[in-house]
Regions:
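Juxtamembrane intracellular "pre-TM" segments in multi-pass secondary transporters
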Residues: 3-27, 219-252
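Helix-to-loop junctions at the C-terminal end of transmembrane segments
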Residues: 84-96, 303-317, 403
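Intracellular juxtamembrane helix-capping segments at the cytosolic ends
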Residues: 137-151, 359-372
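C-terminal ends and interior cores of transmembrane alpha-helices
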Residues: 106-119, 326-340
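Glycine-rich segments within core transmembrane alpha-helices of 12-TM secondary carriers
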Residues: 159-182, 385-395
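Short amphipathic helix-loop junctions that connect adjacent transmembrane helices
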Residues: 50-67, 266-288
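Central cavity-lining transmembrane alpha-helices of secondary-active solute carriers
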Residues: 71-89, 295-307
Length: 439
């Protein structure tokens, strides 16, 4: 049974609409979290979604090698994340989330700044490693802070609120980023220089967020941690908790939900970019067309996030995960039946994918947040993020081969099947470890 049930009568300080916030968390802390959420996913996902222009206009990579190179970069990116993310989560239990969240945005900004300066694939890979350490820290800290601030009865709604800002940021900032190369070209710069200046603009956004985070987030280690245990002991909390069926399920869900995000950011815009190029579009027009559907995915997630958050707080988190896996599996598998990737059918598929993407990530995060022990939550969420990195690694390595050598929709079918597998696991856990508070 669930081992970390908290009472719905838990004391709270602030109340933001239906969201109850723990005592000691200030309005500035909450606003800073939302500000970081607005920028966080957008600046991280642009690394992949904006890559076709780097490959083609900066490095001169042949378009039939885009899938291989994208998969290679994501593969090694996730190796770094796997190495770093559990220690980062454990370290945050000892020194607090704030310095590690600031460092995350600094490294992400440096990665974006260096990326268009690469002269070959090896340099591009090196710069990607810097970025990878930043994303490892950002992913773990966003999840940890979003779980630290609310009372249990508002956990899913709080995570939904951060994902709402994620989605708004994705829609607004991705729309801005996709137009920046054209804006710079209209100002008289060539394509390569425009791509470079676009990346540097994204980099500047990251540095602003880093400054905001160090000033605005709650200081110190989480209040639940009363004494500092050895680092290895803290990391072991994340491993030992996997003996509990619901936490083990959340780790499996992390593999799939983060894989869902990876397949979108790594292959979705690249697929649509290549479809546009096959039809004779210019590189910037093809990139813009791909981003249009990417924005629709995020807009759908934006609409769905509040509804899903409220729904999850009113049901067993495992049942919520089952519903999410149905939506996500249907969304990704539907791409196999889209006749024209740039046509009307794709609008409907993009909306379904958006619903599934946000449901999968929100349900898995709220499940691990509820089941993790208050002391050591950072370590458990760090382990959750590590399993998420494994999912991204699998999507990058297998998906890259499928994309280039089998079919451009291969990676999407792969993650669709993975969602169905987790659906089956969730049904089993629901039977063997029911939640008595939602029975």
């Amino acid at each position: 049974m669930s081992a970390s049930i908290q009472s719905d009568t838990e004391e709270y300080g602030l109340k933001l609409g239906p969201i109850k916030i723990l005592k000691g968390v200030s309005p500035v802390n909450i606003l800073t979290l939302f500000f970081a959420s607005f920028f966080g996913i957008a600046v991280m996902s642009y690394m992949n979604s904006g890559q076709p222009l780097i490959f083609g206009q900066i490095l001169g990579v042949a378009e039939n090698d885009f899938g291989r190179l994208a998969g290679k970069l994501t593969f090694y990116h996730e190796i770094i994340v796997i190495i770093c993310i559990a220690p980062i989560g454990a370290l945050s239990d000892r020194i607090g989330r704030r310095p590690l969240y600031m460092l995350a945005f600094l490294l992400i900004g440096i990665g974006h700044f260096l990326y268009p300066l690469a002269e070959n694939e090896d340099q591009l890979l090196l710069f990607r490693m810097v970025f990878a350490v930043g994303t490892a820290s950002a992913s773990a800290m966003l999840a940890a802070v979003a779980n630290d601030y609310p009372v249990e009865s508002s956990r899913a709604k709080m995570i939904a609120a951060t994902m709402l800002f994620n989605a708004v940021g994705m829609v607004v900032l991705t729309g801005l980023f996709k137009n920046l190369p054209d804006i710079y070209q209209n100002a008289g710069y060539d394509v390569a220089t425009s791509v470079k200046y676009t990346r540097w603009t994204v980099s500047g956004c990251c540095f602003v967020v880093a400054a905001a985070v160090i000033v605005g987030l709650k200081k110190g280690a989480p209040s639940q941690v009363t004494e500092r245990e050895p680092m290895l002991s803290t990391i072991m909390v994340g491993l030992s908790q996997a003996r509990k069926p619901r936490i083990a399920l959340s780790y499996a869900a992390a593999v799939v939900s983060r894989g869902d995000l990876a397949v979108l950011s790594t292959f979705f815009t690249t697929w649509l970019f290549l479809e546009g190029r096959d039809r004779g579009m210019t590189a910037t027009d093809a990139m813009s067309g791909g981003f249009t559907f990417y924005i629709i995915v995020q807009a759908a997630a934006l609409v769905a996030a509040p509804v899903i958050g409220i729904m999850l707080d009113r049901m067993d988190r495992v049942i919520g995960l089952i519903i999410a896996m149905v939506l996500a599996g249907a969304g990704y598998l539907s791409l196999a039946f889209v006749g024209d990737p740039l046509g009307t059918e794709m609008y409907f598929a993009a909306v379904l994918i958006g619903f599934g993407e946000i449901a999968a990530n929100l349900s898995s995060l709220s499940l691990v947040g509820k089941e993790a022990p208050p002391k050591g939550r950072g370590a458990v969420i760090g382990m959750f993020s590590l399993f998420g990195a494994v999912g991204i690694l699998l999507v990058a390595s297998i998906g890259g081969v499928l994309f280039d050598e089998v079919s451009r929709i291969g990676p999407f079918v792969l993650v669709g099947i993975a969602n169905i597998i987790v659906l089956v696991l969730a049904v089993i856990v629901l039977k063997v470890d029911p939640d008595p508070y939602n029975a």
